[in-house]
Structures are given as structure tokens and as C-alpha cells.
Amino acid sequence: MSILAQIIGLACLLFWGFWLCCKLRLPAGFAPLCGLCFCMVVLQLAGSCNQLWLGVQLLLVGAVLTLAQRRRHEILPQLLSPGVLAFCSAAGVLMAVFAIRQPEFQTWDEFSHWGIYFKSVFYQHRFAVWDTTRSLAHQAYPQGLPGLYALFALPAAQYREADVLFVTALPLAAAASALFALPQVTARRPRIAYTVCACLAAPALFWLFAPDTPYTTAYMDAPVGALFAAALCVILLPCAANSRVQRGLALAFLCGALTTVKEIGTVFALCVVGIWFLQCLQDALRDKGGILRGFLLPFTAALPCFAIPLAWKLLLKALHRADDQFSSMGPGYFLQCWQEARTGFDRYFYDVWDRYYARLRSYPLLFGASTFKVGCLCAAAAVLLLIVLIWAMGRWQGLRAALPGLCMILYWPLYQGVLFYVYICGMSPYEALEMASWERYFCCFFLGWFSVLEGEALLAGFAAAHRLPRMAGHAVPAIVPCLLVCSTLWGIWQAGGAASLFCLPKADWRTEQQQIAADMLTRMDGAQNGSIWLLSADDSMAVQNMWYYQYELYPAVTAVEAQSSETDVDLGYNIGEHDVTWLVLFGVTDDFTARYADLADDGLRSAQSTAPALYAVTNVDGRIYLTAK
């Protein structure tokens, strides 16, 4: 993706965002967030209808039309607002660093699922769920960010993983812009100092909330946490009685975007709706009227929380893609595991609970503190900010501003229950007992909680400035941004110093593996729409090889299965059953070679040190023939 393609995509987001902020009565600093969420929702719906490229073209044309309707003197103040400058600062740093370093995928799910989603968008111009290449990637995940990638990939000449990582980092930059857009900065306040702090902190504000770095992974946990944080920032904004419908529509776009990132995003979206419901009810009680509106208004934000996931599930079912690892996540399986543990038939439920509880109490998550302690510290900070906000803003306004942070105290134990349910029903026994992805799942929740506390602190600082002497009134609003800059620098230092920001990690093993994959494609003579069966001498590497090489060889060929050659494999039956066109051997045992030597003219050979053994498969009337390549 050229710099020009990135600029076109960012401009499209901003122009749509400015138009939406005008219609929804939001500060201009929320334009990056509004534009991002609007495009994600539109492209998720367009991709679900197999019209992804049409949706991209309509968004680009619409952005040009919205720009043509606006005057120059209206756009410039919006571009110079602290929130927009913070977003542009973060995007600019990422563009420069990624162009220099060209980071790559490094971890399991980036190859097995998310990478295939983005490659399908680039090569097939459609979501993977519509793909005809029989990819084994799980189809249950919604694909809002792969859809957003289409907006940037349309003018791109080639597929690059750095471009994918850039797109997945945009929700974090948009959340930073929403956070710094919260204070209503006026000419009497230190606007320049505040804006400079925002631009310095935004590029790496969320460094603490990812196991490695939040900007160099295609996992969706950091983006879903960032959008959760941004939605909470929207709730923090003061809302006049005549603009509550518009605020509900803004939250509807945000909640809809949350549901398109990952399935857990629906849980976060419902959390946002719950807080919005309490705020609407509080406003109705304060105004002594409109109680019915206070009850009904939150449903404008709740509708996308149910409509978008339901439409996606119906599409998966219609395309026969609904059966995957998440099919057992109904309450029946959870109750079955609990019943078996209670009767002593199988202790699996209790074993997972014991490890879950131990990890919750003792595993260091952030700042060297356990997950439980971090939650307690956040709860204490929420109560303290309630007191400060009531003092600075008055009882009603202070309680309204502190409500999101207080509600997170209630959501904290509920979220623990949701994650325990996921470990029981949505993961393999090995993953559940190892507490896999613990940091990613909890950090996305704390990313939202930390951000709403930071937003409340910003509001408290600017509100308290009116109650303090002149010099103190100028200094207090700058305290929180300065603390954010310091915490950002501390997080970068904890992650490995400046090298972690400007010298992004690259997996050295990728160079050799990419060369092997390219050599395989060369030996396949440019095969298209083929399928491969991978066999490995090392049982622990069988599945890893399948996922990795399926990603590297996509879309020319796709993997249909992977097994260890040490298992009792019926090679002829499996090849015929799965319509395999290529057989790849990553080392085989002598017994395996002896059993199937008659399938190849010169017998089976093991993998060489530089490349696996590759055979073309020919099926003649049920008789399998292997030809070495």
C-alpha cells in the first residue's frame, strides 16, 4: 500500500467523520472515530451481501461529495482540533515507522484466521465466508476490520502485512483522538500545550494493553478494547436535552462497529448500552419528565448490538459455514460440564475454575499487579474521581460524568464470569487449562476502563480550573495530559525502550519459510484453486504447518488437513475423500514410506533440509498416483 493509498483512506474516514459530527452534534475531535465506525458498519453489511467492492466505491464517492458541500473555513478549524491532530499524529507515526520497518505477522492466529480474512479481501474482493477456495479459517468471526482494509486496499498494488497492521491499529488511534477531544478547550485555556501533549501521547497511548505491542499484531483484542474505550468517551460528553436522539445514533454506530470486530465486542456493546440507559434515566429524572423517552432512547443504540450479529449468523448458516469451534458455546454444554464435575464423572469444570481463580489472584497483568489487584485499583480510582467530579462540576453533572467509571465496577465481576464461560465452552481443553490468551482478553477490558478514568480525570481537571486561582487554573488542565505522556513513555520503556517503538520486531524465521512457500508455488507450475494435504514427522508441528502454509500459498492453493506421519493415516482414502491435488511431506517415518511406496513411481522421499517433498496427486478411477515435483 503506497503512502498515497493510506492518505486516501484516512481522508475518506475524516470527511465522513466531519459530516457525521455535524449531523450528530459531536465535537470535531470525534470525527476520526465516527468516520471509522461508520465505514466499518457499512463495509461489514456490504461484505455480508457479497458487494464489498461496491461498498468501498460508494464510500469514496460519498466522501468526495461531503467534501464538496463544505466550505474551506469550516474544515480548517475541525482539522486543527486536538482530537483530530492526535489522530493524525498517531497515523503519521505509524505510516512512517511501518514504511521503514515493514513489520510482519508472527503468531498463530494471524496465519490461521485473520491473515486469511485480509488476503481474501485483497485477492478475492470479498469476505472469506464467500470464498470458493475452501479455506479452513474459522468463519464465525465478524469481519469489520477486514472490510475497512478494503477501503485502503482498493488503490494498493500489492498485499503487504504492514498495511494490514496499519489498518488494525487505526481503532487505537481513533480512541486516542476521542479521549483527547473530551475537554471543551477554549481560547483562555492552554490549548497549544494541551494539543502538543495529545499529539505526543496518542501514537503509543495504549502500549500497556498488549502482550507485545498493540500496533504489530493482527489480533482483534486491542481494536475491540479501543472501540469500547471510545464509546465510553462518547458517553462522557455532556448531552443537551435536544440532542439525545443524535447521541443515541452516534452510540448506535459505535456499538455496531464493536460487534463487527469480534464476537466479544457484542458484550462490550451491551455494556455501553447499559451505561447509556442509566444516563438517559438519570437525565429524565432530573428534568422531571420524559421518563418514557429515558427508557426507549437507549434502544437506538441497542438495535445494532443484536441486528448485526444476528444477520451475520444467518449468513453463516445460509452458506453452511456455521459449524466451527464456537458451535458448542450454548449454555447446554456449560451446564453439562458443571453437572459432570458435580457428580464426580469429570473434573474438567473444576480444574478450569481452579486455574482460572489462581491466575486471577496471582498472575501479574499490568504494573506487576495481579488481574484482581488492577481491578481493585481501578474501582478505587472511580470512586475518588466521583468525589472530585461532584466537587468540580456539581452533584448532578459530577454524578453523570462519573457514572461510566462506576458502572465498570459492576461490569468487572460480570466480565470475569463471561470469560470463564468462554474458557469452558469456546476453547479446547488444552487452551482452557493453560489459560491461553489471558492477557489479551483482560487487557481489552482494562483498556476501556483506563480510558474512561482518564477521560473523567481530563474533565475534572478542566472543570476544576474554574474554581482555582488564575495560575493554578492554567496548570491543572495540563496535569492529566502530562501524566498520560509519562505513562506512555513508561510503557514503552517497559516494552523494551525506544527500540520497541521504532524498531518493531520481525520474525527471523519468516524469511526462510516464505522462500520455501515460494519454491512450492514454483514447483506447482502456477496451480490455481488446488488443495494440499500436509504430513509432518513431528506431531507438534503438523497443525502449525497447515495453518502457516495455507496462509502463504493462499489463494493459489488451500490446505484441507494436516496430520503426523506417525499416525495410522489411510493416505489413499483421505486423498480421494478430500479431493486433494497436492501432497506435502515434512519428513516421514520409514514405516510410512514402506506402506505407500507403490503410490509413486520412485517411492516416497522425505523432506530435504531446504524444502518439503512435494507430490502432484492424480486420481484415476479411484486409483491414486503421486508424481514428485
Predicted segments with their positions:
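Hydrophobic alpha-helical membrane-interfacial segments at the cytosolic entry of transmembrane helices
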Residues: 81-95, 253-255, 287-318, 407-408
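Membrane-embedded, hydrophobic transmembrane alpha-helices
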Residues: 1-79
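Perimembrane helix-loop-helix junctions
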Residues: 67-78, 268-303, 559
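Active-site lumenal/periplasmic loops and adjacent helix-entry segments of GT-C-fold
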Residues: 93-194
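Membrane-lumen/periplasm interface segments of specific transmembrane helices
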Residues: 102-104, 278-282, 291-387
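Hydrophobic/aromatic-rich transmembrane helices and adjacent perimembrane loops
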Residues: 119, 220-228, 267, 429-460
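Membrane-interface alpha helices of multi-pass inner-membrane proteins
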Residues: 41-47, 247-263, 267-274
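Membrane-embedded, lumen/periplasm-facing catalytic core of multi-pass transferases
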Residues: 485-546
